[in-house]
From Swiss-Prot:
Subcellular location: Secreted
Protein name: Cannabidiolic acid synthase-like 2
List of catalytic residues: 484
Annotated family: Belongs to the oxygen-dependent FAD-linked oxidoreductase family.
Protein's organism: Cannabis sativa
Glycosylation site residues: 45, 65, 89, 168, 297, 305, 329, 361, 467, 499
Gene (UniProt): CBDAS3
Lineage: Eukaryota, Viridiplantae, Streptophyta, Embryophyta, Tracheophyta
A GO molecular-function descriptor: FAD binding
Disulfide bonds: 37-99
Binding-site list for substrate: 292, 417
Cofactor annotation: FAD
Signal sequence annotation: 1-28
Function: Has no cannabidiolic acid synthase activity.
Length: 545
């Protein structure tokens, strides 16, 4: 009896020892365990292409930094992923999700790397990046005027391939050609056709999403609630979106543009701005008139160097030169628009003109530039956004513009972008993006610089401007745009039982009354909150399910 008891105790002790040892090994080597698991889904002998990178690989840092668009997040102290996967197909995404979940690693999904806070490639806990660079096909169906776009495709690739198939079709999305469709579409996505057709997210008709269980869902199998949520509510909250089906829209064979510079005393400039903010949102959908401001050094008539504010009034008009000049002279004669200020361009050349990748004086555009994923010169940047519902008083506008003088020359910029058009006609609950009727324009506050040691200086300038404009923009809540993510609005503490209460503070700024519906969807499809970041949609606590 004694021997039997002793033997049982001894065997249990040995089993406990080995279990403890294995648990310690598992905890100590999450990367090793992840790679072992992943080998079942991405066998190394299937393709010559390298799809998985660890910190010991020669090209790890070049892959990591290749699409980091904000150089604030390339320092040695920036958290780095244990592993980067670059899937070729949905099965590779499935494997990455299941293996990350199995070993307790977080996932960050990167499409184009333009996340303003770097949250598509940074985490404060051990994590894996799913980099979708290899999944960038764009398949056009001209007959149905639709396209399937993989989430690793850039906006430039989308515009290029649509135009290759039909010059009178396009898609309502952003200006920057290197922005990835994965994040841009799922956060809303506005651009040159916003007043005509709404956001990118308004024109998505299906999607392929890999959920927390590794299942691939389309619109029918995911259900309308989840399909609603991923169009403007941030797809990364609910899974990894592999592809989008988009509705293509009609564009004119030719459009007319101008971008005129106004260099004048600030009080005279503010009179123009005041006229603009009272009229730009009221124009018909066919005309987009926006303006931006930046400081430049000039030499005055006495040969002295001085810093001044340059303002640019820019347009896209779905019509001819004569019609645009006539319209501007009747509605906004103070701008003094002449025929010589205008250019007639094809739609694809209009996109290139405002893409930021060509010189404004260029007229010989090559659309292949839209396929260049490198994006040219990169910089550190910070950006915030406000929505304006009523005209800002001239005295306040003077102070706002003068704040550009408080920043280094050429670093700070403001963009005023009009609403109106079809945006007034779409319900604020049609998709999670709620910013619709009642908004007259947006203000983008931007700082872009080169030296990382100046990060805090420039970020603080943006914060100062943002604080000053508080009384003049949307209120209760002060609204924000998910694609210009802003961690100053708040972060979620995942260890806190009150993370819903914390998230509601910033969540209602991004989503308004749609926030609670997003929480309900999250609770249903990802109750354990596997897909999360500092500003992710939280599930309700278990007691509320």
């Amino acid at each position: 009896m004694k021997c039997s008891t002793f033997c049982f105790w001894y065997v249990c002790k040995i089993i406990f020892f080995f279990l403890s040892f294995n648990i310690q090994i598992s905890i100590a080597n999450p990367q090793e365990n992840f790679l072992k698991c992943l080998s079942q889904y991405i066998p190394t002998n299937v393709t010559n292409a390298k799809l998985v990178y660890t910190q010991h690989d020669q090209f790890y840092m070049s892959i990591l930094n290749s699409t980091v668009q904000n150089l604030r997040f390339t320092s040695d102290t920036t958290p780095k992923p244990l592993v980067i996967t670059t899937p070729l197909n949905v099965s590779h995404i499935q494997g990455t999700i299941l293996c990350s979940k199995k070993v307790g690693l977080q996932i960050r999904t990167r499409s184009g790397g333009h996340d303003a806070e770097g949250m598509s490639y940074i985490s404060q806990v051990p994590f894996v990046i799913v980099d979708l660079r290899n999944m960038h096909s764009v398949k056009i169906d001209v007959h149905s005027q639709t396209a399937w776009v993989e989430s690793g495709a850039t906006l430039g690739e989308v515009y290029y391939w649509i135009n290759e198939n039909n010059e009178n079709l396009s898609f309502p999305a952003g200006y920057c050609p290197t922005v990835g469709t994965g994040g841009h579409f799922s956060g809303g996505g506005y651009g040159a056709l916003m007043r005509n057709y709404g956001l990118a997210a308004d024109n998505i008709i299906d999607a392929h999403l890999v959920n927390v269980d590794g299942k691939v869902l389309d619109r029918k199998s995911m259900g309308e609630d989840l399909f609603w949520a991923i169009r403007g509510g941030g797809g990364e909250n609910f899974g990894i979106i592999a592809a989008w089906k988009i509705r293509l829209v009609a564009v004119p064979s030719m459009s007319t543009i101008f971008s005129v510079k106004k260099n004048m005393e600030i009080h005279e400039l503010v009179k123009l701005v005041n006229k603009w903010q009272n009229i730009a949102y009221m124009y018909e959908k066919e005309l987009l008139l926006f303006t931006h401001f930046i400081t430049r050094n000039i030499t005055d008539n006495q040969g002295k160097n001085k810093t001044t504010i340059h303002s640019y009034f820019s347009s896209i008009f779905h019509g001819g030169v004569d019609s645009l000049v006539d319209l501007m002279n009747k509605s906004f004669p103070e701008l003094g628009i002449k025929k010589t200020d205008c250019k007639q361009l094809s739609w694809i050349d209009t996109i290139i003109f405002y893409s930021g990748v060509v010189n404004y004086n260029t007229t010989n555009f090559k659309k292949e530039i839209l396929l260049d994923r490198s994006g040219g010169r990169k910089a550190a940047f910070s950006i915030k956004l406000d929505y304006v519902k009523k005209p800002i008083p001239e005295t306040a506008m003077v102070t706002i513009l003068e704040k550009l003088y408080e920043e280094d020359v050429g670093v700070g910029m403001f963009v005023f972008y009009p609403y109106g058009g079809i945006m007034d006609e779409i319900s604020e609950s049609a998709i999670p993006f709620p910013h619709r009727a009642g908004i007259t324009y947006e203000i983008w506050y931007i700082a872009s610089w080169e030296k990382q040691e100046d990060n805090e200086k420039h970020i603080n300038w943006i914060r100062n401007v943002y604080n000053f404009t508080t009384p003049y923009v949307s209120q209760n809540p002060r609204m924000a745009y998910l694609n210009y993510r802003d961690l100053d609005l708040g972060k979620t503490n995942f260890e806190s039982p009150n993370n819903y209460t914390q998230a509601r503070i910033w969540g209602e700024k991004y989503f308004g009354k749609n926030f609670n519906r997003l929480v309900k969807v999250k609770t249903k499809v990802d109750p354990d909150n596997f897909f999360r970041n500092e500003q992710s949609i939280p599930p309700l606590p278990l007691r509320h399910h």
